[in-house]
């Protein structure tokens, strides 16, 4: 999800998506540990998506408009 798309969401929607992505990341790490992970780059993608969403939320908290 692109940053501009994230900025169009409400803060509550972003928090919901972050929670879902954290669950997915947990499952991906579990698969990695058990040797069942087919796409290891997905871990990186999910981590970066979480970071983007948290950045947008933080921008809103401190009043940065982009």
Swiss-Prot record:
It comes from the Bacteria. Keywords: Ribonucleoprotein, Ribosomal protein. Pfam families: Ribosomal_L29. One of its GO terms (biological process) is translation. The keyword ATP-binding does not apply. GO terms for molecular function: structural constituent of ribosome. Coiled coil: none annotated. One of its GO terms (cellular component) is cytosolic large ribosomal subunit. Belongs to the universal ribosomal protein uL29 family. NCBIfam families: L29. HAMAP family: Ribosomal_uL29. This is Large ribosomal subunit protein uL29. It comes from Bacillus anthracis. The gene is rpmC.
């Amino acid at each position: 999800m692109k940053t501009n798309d994230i900025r169009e969401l409400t803060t509550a929607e972003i928090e919901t998506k972050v929670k879902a992505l954290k669950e997915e990341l947990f499952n991906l790490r579990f698969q990695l540990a058990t040797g069942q992970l087919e796409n290891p780059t997905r871990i990186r993608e999910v981590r970066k998506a979480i970071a983007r969403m948290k950045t947008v939320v933080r921008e809103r908290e401190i009043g940065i408009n982009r």
